[in-house]
Structure formats: C-alpha cells, structure tokens
Swiss-Prot record:
GO terms for biological process: G protein-coupled receptor signaling pathway; sensory perception of smell. It holds the Pfam family 7tm_4. Glycans are attached at residue 5. Belongs to the G-protein coupled receptor 1 family. Gene3D superfamilies: Rhodopsin 7-helix transmembrane proteins. GO terms for molecular function: G protein-coupled receptor activity; olfactory receptor activity. Residues 48-57, 119-139, 218-244, 293-309 are cytoplasmic. GO terms for cellular component: endoplasmic reticulum membrane; membrane; plasma membrane. This is Olfactory receptor 7A40.
Length: 309
C-alpha cells in the first residue's frame, strides 16, 4: 500500500543539534551567548562605520553590509532554536519553515557574494592603488552591493518557491536546528528532480562563481605583492587583506566541513552540528577578525564607546 502524500501539512518538527534533554540547558546558554556576541560585535561595526568619517571608504562600506548580513543570517535560525529549547516545543509551522528556507538561503548566499566583492576591493587597492578611489567610486560600490542583494534575493525566492511544490508523507522530523532546503527535499514524497537541479545549478553559479572571483583576485594580489621589492612594503600590502583572507578561509573551510560531514557520516545530527560553524560561529568571529589588527576600526570603536560613556 502506497503512502498518500499529505500536501496540507501545517507543521514540521525541528530535532535540533541534540535530542538529549540533559544537553538542552547547556545548548540554550551557549547559543544565547554566541547570538548576543554576534549581535553586539556586528552592530558595533555598523554603527562605527556610519558615524566615523574616517571609515567612509569602500572597504568599510562593504564590511558594514557583511556585518548586517551576518546579523540577519544568524537571526534567521537562532532565535527560533532558543525558543524551541526554552519551551521544549520543537514544532515550526509550515509557513515559518518556508520563511526560514528563504532567509537562510538569502543571507547565506549574500555572505558569499559580499566576500567576493570585498576580494575585488582588495584587488583594486593593492594592484591599482593610484586609481583606487576612481575605480571604487560610490556608484560602483552601490551597484556591487545592490547587485548582490538582487541576485541572492531572486535565487532565494526561486528556491523557496520550488519548495512549495514538495509533498510530504508521514515523517516530518527535520534533523536540524533550522529548516534547511536540502533536508526538506530529503523528506519529500514526490519527484524532487526539479528541486535537485535548481539547487545544483545554484551551487555552481552562486557558490562557485564568487569563489572563482575570490581566487582570481587573490592570485593577482599575490603576484603584485611578490613584485614589491621591500619586505616592509610586502608586509604592509599583505596586512590590508589579511583579515578578509582569514574570514574567507574560515567561511569556506566550514562549508567544506558541512559537505564532508553530510557525505561520510550516518549520524542524522552531524550536518546540523557542522552547520553551526558557518551559520553561527563564523558570523560571531568576523567582527573580531576584522577589528583586532585594524587600527582604524579599533580607533573608531574606541571613539564610539567614549561618546556613549
């Protein structure tokens, strides 16, 4: 007897990172702490770049957009997770699940695009320093950010709309702390080939494209740095992109970790645990990576905190 597809489902169950009740208080405290640190760190960067005239440059304009995207990325999943743990109710409505799919894809891919834009900014700064302000003018900066938003929004709208065509049977349990599109596709009873193809091509175009741009930019940056004769000049040139390179390495290494964990393990919660690295830990660490060795940003933050006090 075949299972009948239930297209009128009203809810899913998010199993989270662990179903062990003994772990729930620890997980609540840990993720609440990481979420608050993420909000505070990224908000400080946004406020500092807006209020301090020394930071009104293309690099910090892109950084403030990345900080905003990171806040939204974590806010798409962590608040609901905290509510579920606190209330001991793992249910999420169908509408809420589709909304999570939309925003999780939107801000996750937007991070990817903004990192590529920032790599291009560093390429122009190091390889064409005399023409930097001419090339990276306000119009181009606005176009790059707006283009990133529009492209990722259209992709997210397409993929979440495709999720609406999925039909589900009896198992509505998602072994994750967020409604991830891939998990919904795995639960679906009907033909998922169109969804698989859209996800596949989106991963190649919107994931591989920005990564290729980052790699190309840094290949040119490395060539330019090697051509500098003095060691002090090489160090100064490299230091301008060290923070961005660290963030890029962290972001893509954690994404690779998620892919490998989902491919080589049978643990249903392993993907969720690995996803914490790129969806929670990376947005939390980004403000520290960008500010610790950045004298301009640290100075702006000190001036901001002095004004507040």
């Amino acid at each position: 007897m075949e299972l009948k597809n239930d297209t009128q489902i009203s809810k899913f169950i998010l199993l989270g990172i662990s179903e062990d009740p003994l772990w729930q208080p620890f997980l609540f405290g840990l993720f609440l702490f990481m979420y608050l640190v993420t909000l505070l760190g990224n908000l400080l960067i946004i406020i500092a770049t807006i209020t301090d005239s020394h930071l009104h440059t293309p690099m910090y304009f892109f950084l403030s957009n990345l900080s905003f995207a990171d806040i939204c990325f974590t806010s798409a999943s962590i608040p609901k997770m905290l509510v579920n743990i606190q209330t001991k109710n793992k249910v999420i409505t169908y509408e809420g699940c589709i909304s999570q799919v939309f925003f999780f894809i939107l801000f996750g891919v937007l991070d990817n695009f903004l990192l590529a834009v920032m790599a291009y900014d560093r390429y122009v700064a190091i390889c064409h320093p005399l023409h930097y302000m001419v090339i990276m003018n306000c119009r181009l900066c606005g176009f790059l950010v707006l283009g990133s938003w529009v492209t990722t929004a259209l992709n997210s709208l397409l993929q979440s709309s495709m999720a609406l065509r999925l039909s589900f049977c009896t198992d509505l349990k998602i072994p994750h702390f967020v409604c991830e599109l891939n998990q919904l596709v795995l639960l679906a009873c009907n033909d998922t080939f169109p969804n698989d193809m859209v996800m596949y091509f989106a991963a190649i175009l919107l994931g591989g494209g920005p990564l290729a741009g980052i790699l190309y930019s840094y290949s040119k940056i490395v060539s330019s740095i090697r051509a500098i004769s003095s060691s002090q000049g090489k160090y100064k040139a490299f230091s301008t992109c060290a923070s961005h390179l660290s963030v890029v390495s962290l972001f893509y290494s954690t994404l690779l970790g998620v892919y490998l964990s989902s491919s080589f393990t049978q643990n249903s919660h392993s993907t969720a645990r690995a996803s914490v690295m790129y969806s929670v830990v990376t947005p939390m660490l980004n403000p520290f990576i960008y500010s610790l060795r950045n004298k301009d940003l640290m100075g702006a933050l000190r001036r901001l905190l002095r004004r507040k006090s």
